[in-house]
């Protein structure tokens, strides 16, 4: 069985963290002792690992102290949420452009989107409708072309001059 990374917060720990954030049960006061020293005095709650602490200083500025793995987890969750939103918007905009096969267009668009991934691992914030329209220009075979589909050639009597009634009997 694969071990989870050490920095991952377990469900019970994350529940405790959420509880400590919502109840603000751990409160402390920060006093300046000297130019290089500060005293952190617990006013309410207890110092426990994986819980948040709400700190006020002598100037009534408020701070929240959380474990570093929580910040990493929050950043990762924010990145995943952004990418999920981007993919959902991309799928919505694909549908508006009348794909012949939605899954094919979705795969092409996701591959092209992955090519835009930045060096830091994040996807850029793009206009998904313009992105899909560009794909439609570059790959018109993936989309219905209603303009050509419903256009009929103008009626021309000459097209029917060679029509032989005997051909009707063969049908």
UniProtKB/Swiss-Prot annotation:
HAMAP family: UPF0763 (MF_02110). The lineage of its organism: Bacteria, Pseudomonadati, Campylobacterota, Epsilonproteobacteria, Campylobacterales. Belongs to the UPF0763 family. This is UPF0763 protein KHP_0657. InterPro entries: UPF0763. It comes from Helicobacter pylori (strain 51). It holds the Pfam family DUF2603.
